[in-house]
Amino acid sequence: MNNKDWTGNAKSIFVCNGASNHTEEERQENDYYATEPKAVELLLQKEKFSSHVWECACGGGHMSKVLAEQGYIVKSSDIIDRGLAGTAIIDFLKVTKEDILNDIQRDIITNPPYKIAREFVEHALEISMKNTKIAMFLKLTFLEGKARKKLFEKYPPKVVYVSSRLQCAKNGDFEKYGKGVGTAVAYAWFVWRKGYKGDTVVKWIN
Protein backbone atom coordinates (compact mmCIF):
# COMPACT_ATOMS: atom_id res chain seq x y z
CA MET A 1 0.00 0.00 0.00
CA ASN A 2 1.48 3.35 -1.03
CA ASN A 3 -0.07 5.88 1.33
CA LYS A 4 2.07 8.71 2.68
CA ASP A 5 -0.34 9.25 5.57
CA TRP A 6 0.05 5.69 6.83
CA THR A 7 2.58 5.48 9.68
CA GLY A 8 1.14 2.58 11.64
CA ASN A 9 1.50 -1.17 11.78
CA ALA A 10 -0.73 -4.21 12.21
CA LYS A 11 -1.80 -3.01 15.67
CA SER A 12 -3.04 0.27 14.32
CA ILE A 13 -6.44 -0.98 13.22
CA PHE A 14 -7.34 -1.50 16.87
CA VAL A 15 -6.44 1.97 18.09
CA CYS A 16 -9.13 4.49 17.24
CA ASN A 17 -12.50 5.52 18.63
CA GLY A 18 -15.24 3.67 16.83
CA ALA A 19 -13.04 1.86 14.31
CA SER A 20 -15.08 -0.76 12.49
CA ASN A 21 -12.54 -3.40 13.59
CA HIS A 22 -13.67 -3.18 17.22
CA THR A 23 -16.10 -5.83 18.43
CA GLU A 24 -18.73 -4.89 20.99
CA GLU A 25 -16.70 -6.80 23.62
CA GLU A 26 -13.60 -4.76 22.82
CA ARG A 27 -15.30 -1.39 23.21
CA GLN A 28 -14.84 0.38 26.50
CA GLU A 29 -17.97 1.09 28.51
CA ASN A 30 -19.68 4.22 27.17
CA ASP A 31 -17.45 4.22 24.06
CA TYR A 32 -14.37 5.68 25.72
CA TYR A 33 -11.51 6.09 23.27
CA ALA A 34 -9.39 9.12 24.16
CA THR A 35 -8.23 11.63 21.56
CA GLU A 36 -4.57 12.32 20.90
CA PRO A 37 -3.82 15.79 22.32
CA LYS A 38 -2.12 16.74 19.05
CA ALA A 39 -5.56 16.74 17.39
CA VAL A 40 -6.65 19.62 19.63
CA GLU A 41 -3.39 21.48 19.11
CA LEU A 42 -3.87 21.30 15.34
CA LEU A 43 -7.45 22.55 15.62
CA LEU A 44 -6.40 25.52 17.74
CA GLN A 45 -3.84 26.50 15.12
CA LYS A 46 -6.73 26.96 12.69
CA GLU A 47 -9.68 28.09 14.82
CA LYS A 48 -10.27 30.55 17.65
CA PHE A 49 -13.02 29.95 20.20
CA SER A 50 -14.73 31.96 22.90
CA SER A 51 -12.77 32.21 26.15
CA HIS A 52 -15.19 29.75 27.80
CA VAL A 53 -15.40 26.31 26.17
CA TRP A 54 -17.20 23.09 27.06
CA GLU A 55 -15.69 19.63 26.63
CA CYS A 56 -18.90 17.65 27.13
CA ALA A 57 -17.44 14.13 26.69
CA CYS A 58 -14.17 14.78 28.47
CA GLY A 59 -13.17 11.26 29.50
CA GLY A 60 -9.78 11.46 31.19
CA GLY A 61 -9.28 15.05 30.11
CA HIS A 62 -6.93 14.68 27.14
CA MET A 63 -8.68 17.51 25.27
CA SER A 64 -9.53 19.57 28.33
CA LYS A 65 -5.92 19.76 29.46
CA VAL A 66 -4.72 21.07 26.09
CA LEU A 67 -7.52 23.64 26.00
CA ALA A 68 -6.64 24.83 29.50
CA GLU A 69 -2.95 25.04 28.60
CA GLN A 70 -3.92 27.24 25.65
CA GLY A 71 -5.65 29.68 27.99
CA TYR A 72 -9.28 28.61 27.65
CA ILE A 73 -11.62 28.42 30.63
CA VAL A 74 -12.82 24.84 30.31
CA LYS A 75 -15.99 23.22 31.59
CA SER A 76 -15.33 19.47 31.54
CA SER A 77 -18.19 17.01 31.83
CA ASP A 78 -19.00 13.39 31.07
CA ILE A 79 -21.66 10.84 31.84
CA ILE A 80 -19.28 9.14 34.31
CA ASP A 81 -16.15 10.20 36.18
CA ARG A 82 -12.96 8.95 34.51
CA GLY A 83 -10.58 10.61 36.92
CA LEU A 84 -10.24 14.18 35.64
CA ALA A 85 -10.39 16.51 38.63
CA GLY A 86 -13.37 18.82 38.48
CA THR A 87 -15.38 16.74 36.00
CA ALA A 88 -19.09 17.54 36.17
CA ILE A 89 -21.25 14.42 35.83
CA ILE A 90 -23.68 15.41 33.08
CA ASP A 91 -25.59 13.40 30.48
CA PHE A 92 -25.10 15.80 27.58
CA LEU A 93 -28.11 14.48 25.68
CA LYS A 94 -30.34 15.57 28.57
CA VAL A 95 -29.06 19.16 28.66
CA THR A 96 -31.82 21.61 27.63
CA LYS A 97 -31.89 25.01 25.95
CA GLU A 98 -32.93 26.45 29.30
CA ASP A 99 -29.80 25.01 30.89
CA ILE A 100 -27.72 26.76 28.22
CA LEU A 101 -29.55 30.07 28.63
CA ASN A 102 -28.96 29.97 32.38
CA ASP A 103 -25.24 29.33 31.99
CA ILE A 104 -22.20 31.14 30.60
CA GLN A 105 -22.01 31.26 26.80
CA ARG A 106 -19.58 28.51 25.81
CA ASP A 107 -18.31 27.07 22.55
CA ILE A 108 -18.24 23.26 22.41
CA ILE A 109 -15.19 21.16 21.57
CA THR A 110 -15.34 17.38 21.95
CA ASN A 111 -14.90 13.90 20.54
CA PRO A 112 -18.37 12.39 21.07
CA PRO A 113 -19.01 8.69 21.70
CA TYR A 114 -18.94 6.94 18.33
CA LYS A 115 -22.26 5.12 18.64
CA ILE A 116 -24.16 8.33 19.37
CA ALA A 117 -22.05 10.84 17.46
CA ARG A 118 -24.94 12.04 15.30
CA GLU A 119 -27.15 12.49 18.36
CA PHE A 120 -24.40 14.52 20.05
CA VAL A 121 -23.99 16.77 17.02
CA GLU A 122 -27.72 17.32 16.54
CA HIS A 123 -28.29 17.98 20.22
CA ALA A 124 -25.41 20.45 20.45
CA LEU A 125 -26.77 22.37 17.47
CA GLU A 126 -30.34 22.32 18.76
CA ILE A 127 -29.61 23.61 22.26
CA SER A 128 -26.85 26.10 21.46
CA MET A 129 -27.37 29.83 21.12
CA LYS A 130 -26.82 31.60 17.80
CA ASN A 131 -23.16 32.03 16.82
CA THR A 132 -21.97 29.31 19.20
CA LYS A 133 -19.04 27.48 17.63
CA ILE A 134 -19.17 23.68 17.84
CA ALA A 135 -16.16 21.52 16.95
CA MET A 136 -16.54 17.74 16.86
CA PHE A 137 -13.72 15.26 16.19
CA LEU A 138 -15.42 12.62 14.05
CA LYS A 139 -14.70 9.84 11.61
CA LEU A 140 -14.44 11.25 8.09
CA THR A 141 -17.21 8.83 7.12
CA PHE A 142 -19.56 11.00 9.18
CA LEU A 143 -20.08 12.80 5.86
CA GLU A 144 -21.91 9.76 4.49
CA GLY A 145 -25.55 8.66 4.69
CA LYS A 146 -29.07 9.97 4.13
CA ALA A 147 -29.62 10.92 7.77
CA ARG A 148 -26.39 12.91 7.80
CA LYS A 149 -27.38 14.61 4.55
CA LYS A 150 -30.53 15.93 6.23
CA LEU A 151 -28.45 17.11 9.18
CA PHE A 152 -25.99 18.94 6.92
CA GLU A 153 -28.80 20.55 4.94
CA LYS A 154 -30.26 21.97 8.15
CA TYR A 155 -26.92 22.69 9.83
CA PRO A 156 -24.08 22.89 7.30
CA PRO A 157 -20.63 22.74 8.91
CA LYS A 158 -18.67 25.90 8.23
CA VAL A 159 -15.38 24.01 7.89
CA VAL A 160 -14.28 20.38 7.84
CA TYR A 161 -10.59 19.92 8.66
CA VAL A 162 -9.41 16.57 7.33
CA SER A 163 -6.53 15.08 9.29
CA SER A 164 -3.73 12.74 8.42
CA ARG A 165 -3.96 9.72 10.62
CA LEU A 166 -4.01 10.68 14.31
CA GLN A 167 -4.07 8.32 17.25
CA CYS A 168 -6.89 7.59 19.67
CA ALA A 169 -6.47 5.14 22.53
CA LYS A 170 -8.75 2.67 24.26
CA ASN A 171 -9.25 3.73 27.87
CA GLY A 172 -6.84 6.63 27.29
CA ASP A 173 -3.80 4.32 27.33
CA PHE A 174 -1.64 5.86 24.59
CA GLU A 175 1.55 4.19 25.84
CA LYS A 176 0.09 0.77 25.06
CA TYR A 177 0.18 1.45 21.33
CA GLY A 178 3.63 2.98 21.07
CA LYS A 179 4.87 6.34 19.87
CA GLY A 180 4.12 7.10 16.25
CA VAL A 181 1.55 4.35 15.78
CA GLY A 182 -1.12 5.50 13.36
CA THR A 183 -4.68 4.37 12.80
CA ALA A 184 -6.66 2.73 10.03
CA VAL A 185 -9.45 5.28 10.46
CA ALA A 186 -9.47 8.76 8.91
CA TYR A 187 -10.76 11.57 11.14
CA ALA A 188 -11.71 15.21 10.73
CA TRP A 189 -12.71 18.19 12.80
CA PHE A 190 -16.24 19.25 11.86
CA VAL A 191 -16.75 22.89 12.85
CA TRP A 192 -20.19 24.51 12.97
CA ARG A 193 -21.17 28.09 13.73
CA LYS A 194 -24.79 28.04 14.91
CA GLY A 195 -26.82 29.96 12.34
CA TYR A 196 -24.34 29.57 9.46
CA LYS A 197 -26.09 28.76 6.16
CA GLY A 198 -23.31 28.92 3.56
CA ASP A 199 -21.31 26.24 1.80
CA THR A 200 -19.00 23.95 3.73
CA VAL A 201 -15.27 24.46 3.16
CA VAL A 202 -12.97 21.43 3.31
CA LYS A 203 -9.38 21.98 4.41
CA TRP A 204 -6.47 19.77 5.41
CA ILE A 205 -5.27 20.32 8.95
CA ASN A 206 -1.85 18.66 8.66
Question: For each of these PLM feature ranges, what is it?
Answer:
Residues 1-206:
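Class I S-adenosyl-L-methionine-dependent methyltransferase catalytic core
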